[in-house]
């Protein structure tokens, strides 16, 4: 299976939107569902109302996190969301409303690493995706410092936040769980955690062939697959 550089990942996204007529909310829904299913497989519920924290950023990766939180609530978990930089976009506002109507709490302040360890089963990093470049700015610089110190499982969506999409970041957060969306990015070569899933079962065959992705078979009707 071939891993994607940043420009290839961006090109595939644009082709899905422009040539294959997918909408942003369609792909976000499919991606977020695959994140939620993969988390439920890697970390099955051991009781009722297990608490999870989803940290969402201002872009589409953050939207994937909001969708995942909604599905995780439907799966019987109790997600809470930290979403400090909300863009004024109808899609994101709708996702927030959906979560609020499902009684998912939005936190005003980020808990400390110690508080997270005590309160939550795991934390989902849905802050930055493959389009991120440059320095991490406030408030997310402090968020990543906190996430680097948590002892509970950290679950990264597509690209661990703060990592170079191609080179990774040995000094950054080190998630236990990574779900690559569409196809793994080159930085996934530096992932040393326990669970690496591929999610987003929506890439048309013609696009798979064009980019020579050779993705593994998805089991049954699952939207995700555990990579070896």
Curated annotation (Swiss-Prot):
<keyword id="KW-0630">Potassium</keyword>
<keyword id="KW-0413">Isomerase</keyword>
<dbReference type="GO" id="GO:0000166">
    <property type="term" value="F:nucleotide binding"/>
</dbReference>
<keyword id="KW-0479">Metal-binding</keyword>
<feature type="binding site">
    <location>
        <begin position="129"/>
        <end position="135"/>
    </location>
    <ligand>
        <name>(6S)-NADPHX</name>
    </ligand>
</feature>
<feature type="binding site">
    <location>
        <position position="161"/>
    </location>
    <ligand>
        <name>K(+)</name>
    </ligand>
</feature>
<dbReference type="InterPro" id="IPR036652">
    <property type="entry name" value="YjeF_N_dom_sf"/>
</dbReference>
<feature type="domain" description="YjeF N-terminal">
    <location>
        <begin position="9"/>
        <end position="214"/>
    </location>
</feature>
<feature type="binding site">
    <location>
        <position position="61"/>
    </location>
    <ligand>
        <name>K(+)</name>
    </ligand>
</feature>
<keyword id="KW-0547">Nucleotide-binding</keyword>
<dbReference type="GO" id="GO:0005739">
    <property type="term" value="C:mitochondrion"/>
</dbReference>
<comment type="similarity">
    <text>Belongs to the NnrE/AIBP family.</text>
</comment>
<feature type="binding site">
    <location>
        <begin position="60"/>
        <end position="64"/>
    </location>
    <ligand>
        <name>(6S)-NADPHX</name>
    </ligand>
</feature>
<protein>
    <recommendedName>
        <fullName>NAD(P)H-hydrate epimerase</fullName>
        <ecNumber>5.1.99.6</ecNumber>
    </recommendedName>
</protein>
<dbReference type="Pfam" id="PF03853">
    <property type="entry name" value="YjeF_N"/>
</dbReference>
<dbReference type="GO" id="GO:0046872">
    <property type="term" value="F:metal ion binding"/>
</dbReference>
<feature type="binding site">
    <location>
        <position position="125"/>
    </location>
    <ligand>
        <name>K(+)</name>
    </ligand>
</feature>
<keyword id="KW-0520">NAD</keyword>
<dbReference type="InterPro" id="IPR032976">
    <property type="entry name" value="YJEFN_prot_NAXE-like"/>
</dbReference>
<comment type="function">
    <text>Catalyzes the epimerization of the S- and R-forms of NAD(P)HX, a damaged form of NAD(P)H that is a result of enzymatic or heat-dependent hydration. This is a prerequisite for the S-specific NAD(P)H-hydrate dehydratase to allow the repair of both epimers of NAD(P)HX.</text>
</comment>
<keyword id="KW-0521">NADP</keyword>
<dbReference type="InterPro" id="IPR004443">
    <property type="entry name" value="YjeF_N_dom"/>
</dbReference>
<dbReference type="GO" id="GO:0052856">
    <property type="term" value="F:NAD(P)HX epimerase activity"/>
</dbReference>
<feature type="binding site">
    <location>
        <position position="158"/>
    </location>
    <ligand>
        <name>(6S)-NADPHX</name>
    </ligand>
</feature>
């Amino acid at each position: 299976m071939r891993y994607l550089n940043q420009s290839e990942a961006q090109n595939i996204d644009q082709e899905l939107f422009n040539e294959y007529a997918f909408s942003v909310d369609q792909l976000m829904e499919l991606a977020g569902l695959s994140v939620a299913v993969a988390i439920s497989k890697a970390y099955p519920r051991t009781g009722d109302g297990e608490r999870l924290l989803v940290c969402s950023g201002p872009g589409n990766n953050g939207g994937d996190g909001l969708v995942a939180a909604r599905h995780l609530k439907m799966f019987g978990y109790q997600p809470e969301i930290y979403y400090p930089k909300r863009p004024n976009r109808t899609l994101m506002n709708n996702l927030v409303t959906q979560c609020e109507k499902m009684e998912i709490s939005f936190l005003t302040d980020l808990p400390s690493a110690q508080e997270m360890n005590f309160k939550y089963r795991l934390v989902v990093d849905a802050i930055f995706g493959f389009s991120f470049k440059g320095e991490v700015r406030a408030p997310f610089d402090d968020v990543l410092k906190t996430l680097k110190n948590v002892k509970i499982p950290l679950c990264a969506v597509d690209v661990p936040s703060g990592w170079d999409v191609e080179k990774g970041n040995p000094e950054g957060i080190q998630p236990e769980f990574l779900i690559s969306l569409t196809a793994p990015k080159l930085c996934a070569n530096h992932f040393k955690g326990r669970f690496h899933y591929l999610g987003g079962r929506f890439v048309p065959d013609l696009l798979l062939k064009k980019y020579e992705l050779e993705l593994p078979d998805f089991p049954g009707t699952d939207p995700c697959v555990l990579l070896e």
